[in-house]
Design a protein with these regions (language model features):
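A short acidic-to-branched-hydrophobic micro-motif
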Residues: 77, 126-133
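Active-site nucleotide-donor binding segment shared across nucleotidyl transfer reactions
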Residues: 46-75, 79-85, 89
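Catalytic cores of NTP-dependent nucleotidyl/adenyl transfer enzymes across multiple folds
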Residues: 135-205
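Metal-dependent nucleotidyltransferase catalytic core
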Residues: 30-47, 81-116
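Helical scaffold of the NTase/Pol beta-like nucleotidyltransferase catalytic core
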Residues: 4-59, 192
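Expand to "…catalyze enediolate/carbanion chemistry for C-C bond making/breaking, isomerization
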Residues: 106-110, 114-129, 185-186, 190, ...
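Short connector loops at helix/strand junctions that flank enzyme active sites
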Residues: 53, 70-74, 90, 95-97, ...
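Histidine-centered active-site/metal-ligand motif
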Residues: 60, 127-130, 142
Length: 205
């Protein structure tokens, strides 16, 4: 049985205390755009042209990967590698060559992730990359959450309504993200339960 354990190495911080290295940003949610999937495909091709040897899989994650869902217009990309140590040697500089900044300071809180972001000429964040070991808890949890919302549009709408409400309540991204944690954890648990049921049924045949 595949189990996904709750671990602190996740995009959304589990701690209720705001890390000192996080910068406040105002929340902007854009209506869903088909351009987001096309933008991911473009970045995916660029990444594969440089790190195909080490990237075992590249996935579009986060709210921009869920059709119909309003989101912060930032393309979330997750790269799965066999080994972070190999990725440190071979992938980091290649990703930087595509215009991404490697934000190493976040590894104090998230040592099992390498984080990169790309910004527009105006300094607005447009893309972010989470480089993790494939099939790690971080990898599985991101995909469980994304796939569950893709399969359940009504739940995705609940999530959108929550995000819109929280965006009016909180003035920076950390508080906004932290306030979504309970909803996300509940969805992860439901998705894991569905996965376990399918695995139990498959073992009967």
């Amino acid at each position: 049985m595949v189990q996904v354990h709750v671990a602190p190495s996740f995009q959304i911080t589990d701690s209720l205390e705001k890390p000192t290295n996080m910068v406040a940003r105002q929340i902007y949610l854009a209506p869903y755009s088909d351009d987001w999937a096309m933008e991911f495909a473009k970045e995916n091709a660029l990444l594969l042209s440089l790190i195909k040897e080490w990237a075992q899989d590249i996935q579009h994650i986060g709210s921009t990967a869920i059709p119909g869902l309003a989101a912060k217009p930032v393309i979330d990309i997750m790269i799965g590698v066999k080994s972070l140590s190999e990725a440190d040697l071979h992938c980091v500089s290649k990703i930087q060559s595509l215009g991404y900044d490697y934000i190493q300071k976040y590894e104090v809180e998230l040592p099992n992730r390498r984080y990169f972001q790309k910004t527009s000429p105006q300094g607005i964040r447009t893309h972010q990359i989470h480089l993790v070991e494939i099939n790690s808890d971080i990898w599985k949890r991101h995909l469980l959450f994304r796939d569950y919302l893709r399969l359940h549009p009504a739940i995705a709408k609940e999530y959108e309504n929550l995000k819109k409400s929280l965006a009016k309540t909180y003035s920076d991204t950390y508080e906004y993200a932290n306030a979504k944690t309970t909803f996300i954890r509940n969805i992860e648990a439901k998705a894991q339960g569905k996965l376990n049921q399918r695995e139990r049924r498959s073992r009967k045949y």
